[in-house]
Amino acid sequence: MANWISSKLKAAETILQQLDQQAADSLRKDEKSETHDEVFETSPKSGSSPVSLKDQLRKKTYEGSDSGSGSQRNSTEQKPSYLSSSKKVRKPDQSHERTSAPSQSLTQDNTKLTDNDWTELLSTPNQRTSTSTSRSPGGTSAIRGLKKDGKRHGNLGKNPLVSDGKKSSSSNVVNSRGRPQKQTNKEPSDKEVSSPSDADMKNRNAPRDIFVNSTHKESEKDVSGKTPPLDDSRRSANETLPRETSPSVGKRDGRESRRSSVWGKQVREEVSQSNVSDGLTRKESSLSSDESESDYESDSSTDSERERQREERRRRRERVFAEKVATKAVAVIKERENMVARLEGEKLSLEKIVEERAKQQAQEAAELQTNMMETLEAADLEKQKHNNTRMEVLTRLAGLEAENAELTRSLAAGQKKLETQIDQVAVLKQQVELKESTLEELKRNTFNIGGRGTTLKQLDTSRGDKFEHQMLEAEISLLTDKIGRLQDKATKLEADIEMMRKELEEPTEVEIELKRRLNQLTDHLIQKQSQVEALSSEKATILFRIEAVSRLIEENKGMSATEASSQDLEAGDWELSGSKFKPAFQDKIRSGKKHLGWLVMQLNAIFISGTVFLRRNPTAKIWAVVYLVCLHLWVLYILLSHSDASSSGELRSGAVISLENFSNSSLQ
């Protein structure tokens, strides 16, 4: 988006510059049009224009002048019939009868227009514009040839060359000799010859009528101040007319071919028209020289009145035309100013959009930074929770291991007791077996003892043996009971041992839950770490984009500051603002700021990681404090020792130098 806005700003600036250049060029052209060289350069261009406003106004003056003298009007309308056939030239009466009707139609069409009707003059039909356009090529070429001959040969004056130069301006000298008859007859012939090219160039040469009118005015002033010469000079001027128009056309072609190829095409068309018109003027001059001598004496009385009327009309026309040109120029200038103001408004709106986008990007960057901080804090909290749960699990595992060790110890002690009791039972069984063997021996002895005298004794002994036997049986029963109880205890201990083994081999529900919780926390931690990495990458990309956008904005500001210029539309002056070295200096400052900011960011990251590490490890805090204290003490020691050594060295060197100087002076 920033690139699009910058491209739009550049396009608007280029359009403004083009408009300013066009306005300055138009003003320069208006200033240069007052000189004679620009007049003669632009007059041939307007010669081939199909619709000339000045020619239309002149056509109206012809009709006004012809209304005063009907014979001259009829004679001016003879030329189209003359060009249609060479036989009708010798019979002016017949041509007059045939051409009276078209002359009346032309006068009726022209009388409908007024001097102040600008739109009707532009919307006139092609038949009238072609006749008016045929006057301008010959008129402009004749004016150029007239000025050159006026400088070289001062004796030519107002010959037929002057009459040819006044086809579009209707001068008084030509009318006094009756030349308007031949000139007006020449205009339809030029129309018949040059109408295809004039119709093609109708739209291309309309803007150049302003300069053509100025050239016609100057030509009328130059020609009206001279006196008519003899017929011989007129004929010589008619003969020299094509010779003088051709180099003028060559000059014009040479000048305009250097400007553009379009002007070259127009010049070639004008040359073709001028060649045709030159051929016609030669024929007309040879035929009209005889008739002009007869008409000159009859029209000499009305010359002064016609001159005054035509001068008044010409002045009035010039005044109206100048006012129209001025209003048109003011309208063009206003349009250009409005366009410039509109483009400036668009430029300001685009700048506002750029500023708003920059603000939005800054806000987004701030929001992203806050989100990053929040996510980092959440990740730290999750890490702390994970560490806490891990410590709890470790403590529980340590307790379970201690309980397991105690149980194994108690199992080993019970097994030892069981073994000792089993040994005791075995010993008691052996004793019981010995007693039983002794009892059987005693029984056999009692059966073997004979005699009744001894029976009592035997009975007493048997009774004692029985009593002992009972005692032994009681002891045996007690021992068997103890053995049963011990066996029960052994079975219970074995069952407990098996349960403990099962518990050790198979984890309990609590341990399973703890392991599941631990796995969930590790997965959550991995996800958080991936999110943190993604956010860090997004942050890096956003920072890169922010730097790029800021760089573009600064470059656009620098370009606008360096390329900002103010142009005076009336004078065409440019005033450039800014300096050439300012952007380079700003670029250096910007690069230095970027490097410094990068270093500060790196140091900040290092310090943040160090603070996090020290916050989690209290022993590291103590060692860091001790290291900093030792480092400061070492730096102070180095500084103090270096200052003492440098001061003592300076004193020693000064003392040695003074002793050497003293010894040298004493030796001398």
Swiss-Prot record:
One GO CC term, this protein: Golgi apparatus
Role played: Golgi matrix protein playing a role in tethering of vesicles to Golgi membranes and in maintaining the overall structure of the Golgi apparatus.
Domain notes: The C-terminal domain (508-668) is necessary and sufficient for Golgi targeting.
Lipid metabolism listed as a keyword: no
Annotated protein name in UniProt: Golgin candidate 2
Coiled-coil ranges per UniProt: 331-539
Biased amino acid composition, Polar residues: 64-86, 100-113
Entries under InterPro entries matching the protein: Golgin_subfamily_A_member_5 (IPR019177)
Gene coding for it: GC2
Membrane protein topology class: Multi-pass membrane protein
Cellular location(s): Golgi apparatus membrane
Transmembrane segments: 594-614, 622-642
Keywords linked to the UniProt accession: Coiled coil, Golgi apparatus, Membrane, Transmembrane, Transmembrane helix
Primary localization class, coarse: Golgi
Residue ranges, compositional bias (Basic and acidic residues): 26-39, 184-207, 215-237, 250-259, 303-312
GO process annotations (BP): Golgi organization
Biased composition (Low complexity): 123-141, 168-178
Composition skew (Acidic residues), residue ranges: 290-302
Domain of life: Eukaryota
PANTHER family: GOLGIN CANDIDATE 2 (PTHR13815:SF5), GOLGIN-84 (PTHR13815)
Positions of region (Disordered): 22-317
Lineage: Eukaryota, Viridiplantae, Streptophyta, Embryophyta, Tracheophyta
